[in-house]
A protein has these predicted regions:
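Amphipathic alpha-helical hairpins
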Residues: 2-202
């Protein structure tokens, strides 16, 4: 009977093939989304917009003090007080977003919010103390602030998702929902407590 000779060349080739397909995992650490995007123009714009709204939220906290003091009805005073407390939470959330991005929490002067707040101060000066007309005007001023914030946070959420910053997007989304709720609440106060009585004033 013929003896079967083992083909050592085939074995060697097979072992080399197996070795080639079972490479060791790379020791290089995968980059985070932030590290990947930090030099992109969209990331830089996102960061600039965060600094902008960070400044704005601080300015709004101060403005709400004056608006609460100037308001006539307890309903509106309470709404301004509640929103001031809420805005402080928004500032804290923004600081968490900066931390997620591994960036220093910095403010950039926001001309838009400064203009809206200045308009609110002019309303206080130009309306009668204790009048419903003042409250109606203050609600409009406050809703201008809300609409600015809603537009800003809505845009920031979308950019965060585009850049893959999902945790940041979740935090910004929470604030966006709260801003929308505040806007609706101010409308309810105007409709239920203020506008009709303001219309009756001389």
């Amino acid at each position: 009977m013929a003896t079967k000779i083992l083909d050592t060349n085939s074995i060697t080739g097979a072992s080399e093939s197996i070795s080639a397909t079972t490479k060791k995992p790379s020791a290089t650490k995968a980059k985070t989304d932030t590290e990947t995007n930090e030099n992109s123009s969209l990331h830089q714009f996102f960061l600039s917009a965060l600094k902008d709204i960070y400044f704005a939220e601080d300015a709004i906290i101060e403005a709400l003090d004056k608006m609460q003091e100037a308001a006539t009805t307890e309903e509106l005073k309470d709404a301004f007080e509640d929103h001031q407390l809420q805005t402080k939470k928004h500032v804290s959330r923004l600081e968490k977003v900066f931390k997620i991005l591994e960036e220093k929490a910095e403010k950039k002067e926001c001309e838009a919010i400064k203009g809206i707040i200045k308009e609110g101060e002019e309303i206080i000066k130009s309306t009668e103390d204790g009048s419903m007309t003042r409250d109606a005007a203050l609600i409009i001023a406050a809703q201008k602030v809300e609409h600015y914030e809603i537009a800003t946070y809505g845009g920031l959420v979308q950019i965060a998702l585009t850049l893959g910053y999902d945790k940041a997007a979740d935090l910004l989304e929470q604030t966006l929902v709260e801003e929308e709720d505040t806007d609706e609440h101010l409308t309810e106060i105007a409709e239920n407590y203020i506008n009709f009585e303001a219309e009756q004033e001389d």
